[in-house]
A protein has these predicted regions:
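Acidic, surface-exposed loops and disordered segments
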Residues: 1-179
Length: 179
């Protein structure tokens, strides 16, 4: 329900401009330029989210576009130096979902120095809030907590097609050079 947007990291266009103006690819294959393009793409995503929400539309960010990166590249028939960064579904909401609880500020912000020392027990209150959130949802109800998700099987040695992301990015000619 709604429209699907897939936001693409696009350095192909820059390559074509350089080529038509008599230049080689220059630094287009570097990690630095890849990160700049990724950041530009994420800013575009955020701008579309802001615009959609200002019009009363609902949004669902979809990281699942990278669940099978090789298949996604094939389906989208993308040229070299491009890569699908994020999907976004935009549409008229059929319900008013409860907002997912956010980590407390003391775990997401800092001043001048990253706080390295904390105890998992400090997340107890947040875990309870997240557990209640999942338990009260209309769809995909479950008993779960933030710390259980972080400590769960997804971050163990679990192998899936998402493990091919770096290979897929490199196959597109992106982030090949770390200089």
């Amino acid at each position: 329900n709604g429209d699907l947007f897939i936001f693409i990291i696009d350095l192909y266009r820059n390559q074509q401009i350089r080529k038509q103006m008599g230049n080689d690819d220059g630094r287009l294959h570097t990690m630095d330029i890849f990160f700049q393009a990724l950041q530009d793409t994420m800013l575009a995503v955020q701008n579309v989210i802001n615009a959609a929400e200002s019009m009363g539309l609902g949004i669902v960010p979809l990281g699942t576009v990278n669940d099978d990166p090789k298949a996604m590249l094939k389906v989208l028939d993308l040229p070299e130096l491009t890569y699908p960064a994020l999907g976004l579904q935009v549409g008229v909401p059929d319900q008013e979902p409860q907002l997912k609880p956010r980590l407390p500020l003391e775990f997401t912000t800092f001043e001048n120095e990253y706080p390295r020392d904390f105890e998992v027990s400090e997340l107890k209150d947040y875990d309870e809030i997240v557990q209640t959130y999942y338990d009260l949802r209309d769809a995909n109800r479950r008993i779960d907590s933030f710390t259980n998700q972080i400590n769960g099987k997804k971050l163990n040695t679990h192998q899936n097609k998402r493990d091919d992301i770096v290979e897929a990015i490199h196959s597109q000619g992106l982030a090949l050079d770390f200089n």
